[in-house]
Amino acid sequence: MASNKISFSFVLCLYMCSLLDAKSMNPTGRRCPDPNGVEKKSMCYSSCKTQGFMGGSCQGHKGNYMCECYEG
């Protein structure tokens, strides 16, 4: 009986932690220039706002940067 309560508590804790990750990123597939830490033209932000997201930024690694939108 005690192990069931512990298992339930553990699963509940994991579920709550997943809900706290509200600012998940959504890759859009739109390429963007190398941001060097700052996206100067705000291309991704405005593109994501147009699609109904809360905002976005240019993310990735050298030679492969994509716009990623914030869902919430």
Swiss-Prot record:
Secreted is among the record's keywords: yes
GO cellular component: extracellular region
Signal sequence range: 1-22
Key words, A-Z: Antimicrobial, Disulfide bond, Fungicide, Plant defense, Secreted, Signal
Any one GO biological process: defense response to fungus
Domain of life of the source: Eukaryota
Disulfide bonds: C32-C58, C44-C67, C48-C69
Cellular location(s): Secreted
Main subcellular location of this protein, as a coarse class: secreted
Coiled coil feature spans: none
Family membership: Belongs to the DEFL family.
Protein name: Defensin-like protein 35
Organism lineage string: Eukaryota, Viridiplantae, Streptophyta, Embryophyta, Tracheophyta
